[in-house]
């Protein structure tokens, strides 16, 4: 087993501070803790990606963790904007939401979400999803991966 030495760059998009903190704490269990950026809604996420991220010449996030139901701009709209943008479309997006409604799940996958996890989340399942996404997308992961 090989462990990368580069920390993941993760963008958490969630209007609930308690949920965002829980997600951040779950990420901290990685071999190399990630660089985490948090924003409270979809509009802030797109502003961040365009100002701080790809368009500013800074490395794009390795992973976006996205809530669906937020003020100003919800997760569905953010996901659509990300997937329509040639500079952002390759970033894996995991939907993390309290909704287990079939239309939300199907809609997220139809919008090309990389994964869908309901909150409250099982930490082992969350870690497995993050590891799998890093293997699948070829990111230099901070979590253990097989060589």
What residue ranges belong to the model's regions?
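Non-catalytic signal-transmission and effector/linker regions of two-component phosphorelay proteins
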Residues: 1-11, 18-35, 43, 50, ...
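Conserved phosphotransfer cores of two-component systems
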Residues: 53-59, 83-90, 111
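Short, glycine/charged-rich "phosphate-handling" switch motifs in NTP-dependent
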Residues: 114
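Receiver (REC) domain active-site loop signature in two-component systems and cognate sites
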Residues: 68-73
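Negatively charged, flexible loop motifs adjacent to catalytic sites
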Residues: 87, 99-103
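Active-site residues of response regulator receiver
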Residues: 67, 97
